[in-house]
Amino acid sequence: MTEISAKYEQLIEDLRRDYRPQREWGEGRGVFLVIGHFLVGVAAGAWLFGIIFNYVPGLVAGFLLAGGGGIAHLAFLGRPERFWRMVRHVRTAWISRGFVGLTLFLVGGVLYLPPLVLTGWPWAADSMLGYLGWGMAAFGMVVLIVYMGFVYTASKGIPFWNSPLHPVLYMAYALRGGIAALLVTMAVFNAPSVDATSLVTIWIAVTAVVIVLFALEIQGALTGGNPAARRSVREMLAGRMAVYFYGGTLLIGLVVPLALLSGHIAPLSVGILAAIGLFSALGDFFMKYTTIRAGIYLPLRPRQGRHVE
C-alpha cells in the first residue's frame, strides 16, 4: 500500500501543475520500455549491417539483442502473459506493429541463423526454410527500425514527441546503434573480418545526421509556439534531465567516442573500436532516456493571464 499511496500522492501533485511530466515511460517499471526500445533498435541495425557486410556474428548479436528487447518489453507490461493481445490492434497502434515486427524478426532469425553457425543442421541457409527465415527477419527488421519513432509521435498529448523529425531521428539511432553493435561484436567474438574503415566512416556520417536532426528538433520545439514543448527542452537542457543529457548523451555518447577515434588517447585497434561502439551505444540509450523522461503533457485546462515558458 505504501507504493500505491506514493504513486497516488505523486499523481495528485502532478495534476496541480500547469505542465506535468509524463512518468509512465521511464520511471519505475517504465524504464524497461526504454531499455526494450533501445535494444530492439540496436538489434535491427546490427542485423542490417550484418547482412550488408555478410557478417554472421553481427546477425547473432542482433538476434540476441532483439531477444533481450522482447524480455524488457514483457517486464514493462503489468500482465506479461497477455502480451499476445497486442496483435489485435496492429491496424491502429504502432506498439502493436512493433510487436508483430519483433515476432517476425525473432522467428525469422530462428529459421535463418542456425544453419549459418551450426554444422549438420537439418536445413541450409539457402534452402526454402532459410530463405523464408531471411525474408521474415528482413521484414521484421524494417518494422523495428521504422516503428519506434512513430510510437512517440502518436502521443498527441506530449508536444515535444509530436515532431515529424522524431521517426527519422529514431531510424538514424537504429543505424548508429547497429554499427556500434558490430564494432563491439568484432572484439567479443574475436572475429574482426568486417572492413572497420567502412564501419567507422558510416558511423561518422550517421552521427553527423543525428546531430543535425536533433538540433533541428530542439530548434523546432523552441520556436514552434508550444510552451509544453519548450518546457520539455528546458527539462532536458537545464532541468532534471540535464545531468543525463550532458553526462550521458554528449560526454559518453559523443565526446568520448570522437576522442578515441582521433587516436590521441591510444592507437586504433579492435579493442578501441569496441570501446567506441560501446560508448556510442550508451550515449544513444541516454538520448532516448532523456527525451522520453523530458516529455511534458499539455495542460489539462488553460490558465488565463499566465504564460509559462
Which positions does each model-derived feature cover?
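Short, highly charged, low-complexity non-transmembrane loops/tails of multi-pass membrane proteins
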Residues: 295-309
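Membrane-interfacial segments
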Residues: 52, 78, 153-156, 188-192, ...
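Residues within alpha-helical transmembrane segments of multi-pass membrane proteins, especially transporters
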Residues: 43, 47, 64, 71, ...
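N-terminal signal-anchor module of multipass membrane proteins
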Residues: 1-56, 60-63, 294
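Membrane helical hairpin/interfacial module
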Residues: 46-108
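Long, contiguous internal "core" modules enriched in hydrophobic/ aromatic residues
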Residues: 30-31, 35-39, 89-93, 101-286
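Membrane-helix cytosolic exit motif
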Residues: 282, 286-298
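Short helix-terminus and kink motifs of transmembrane alpha helices
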Residues: 77, 81, 213-217, 290-292
